[in-house]
C-alpha cells in the first residue's frame, strides 16, 4: 500500500471544465469531490442528504429562498437535506464538495447541468 497525500492543486490541474465534480477520495460511503464553478447554477435540493461546500479559492454565494450565504477561500457551509439552494460564482471558484456516493449535482432537478457521477481523477 502506498501512503501519499492528495495534492489538491495537482488535481485541479487535471481538468478545466466547470460544474463537473471529480472524485478524489472516498471515506466510508462519502466522496470528496473537487469542482470548478463560475456563473449561475440551477435551483435544486437533495432530499436524502446534507451537502458540504468548502471553498478553496475564490468567492461562492449560495442562494436560498430566504437569503444567501457568501463563502471565501478557507470557509465552508453545510446545506441541510431538503433545503433548496442555488450556487453562484461571479468569477471562477475552486471548491471541494463532500457528499454520499451517487448524489447527482443537480439533486432533484436533473437537466442539462447534471454531471456524470463517480468520475475519479
Question: Can you annotate each of these PLM segments?
Answer:
Residues 28, 56-57, 72-73, 91:
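A cytosolic small-molecule/anion-sensing beta-strand core signal
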Residues 17-18, 31-47:
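Conserved short histidine dyad/triad with adjacent acidic residue
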Residues 31, 40, 59-61, 68, ...:
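Structural motif
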Residues 1-33, 110-121:
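A short, N-terminal "cap"/entry segment at the start of jelly-roll beta-barrel domains
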Residues 81-111:
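Ligand-binding loop in jelly-roll beta-barrel domains
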Residues 65-82:
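Short acidic-glycine-tyrosine-enriched beta hairpin
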Residues 36-37, 46-63, 98:
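Short, conserved beta-strand element in jelly-roll/cupin
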Residues 64-65, 73, 89, 107:
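Short glycine-/acidic-enriched loop or helix-start segments at secondary-structure transitions
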Amino acid at each position: 500500500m502506498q501512503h501519499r497525500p492528495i495534492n489538491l492543486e495537482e488535481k485541479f490541474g487535471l481538468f478545466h471544465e466547470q460544474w463537473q465534480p471529480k472524485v478524489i477520495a472516498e471515506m466510508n460511503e462519502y466522496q470528496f469531490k473537487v469542482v470548478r464553478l463560475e456563473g449561475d447554477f440551477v435551483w435544486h435540493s437533495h432530499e436524502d442528504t446534507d451537502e458540504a461546500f468548502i471553498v478553496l479559492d475564490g468567492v461562492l454565494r449560495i442562494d436560498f429562498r430566504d437569503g444567501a450565504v457568501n463563502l471565501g477561500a478557507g470557509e465552508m457551509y453545510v446545506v441541510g437535506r431538503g433545503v433548496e439552494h442555488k450556487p453562484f460564482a461571479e468569477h471562477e471558484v475552486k471548491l471541494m464538495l463532500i457528499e454520499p456516493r451517487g448524489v447527482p449535482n443537480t439533486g432533484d432537478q436533473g437537466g442539462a447541468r447534471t454531471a456524470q457521477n463517480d468520475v475519479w481523477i
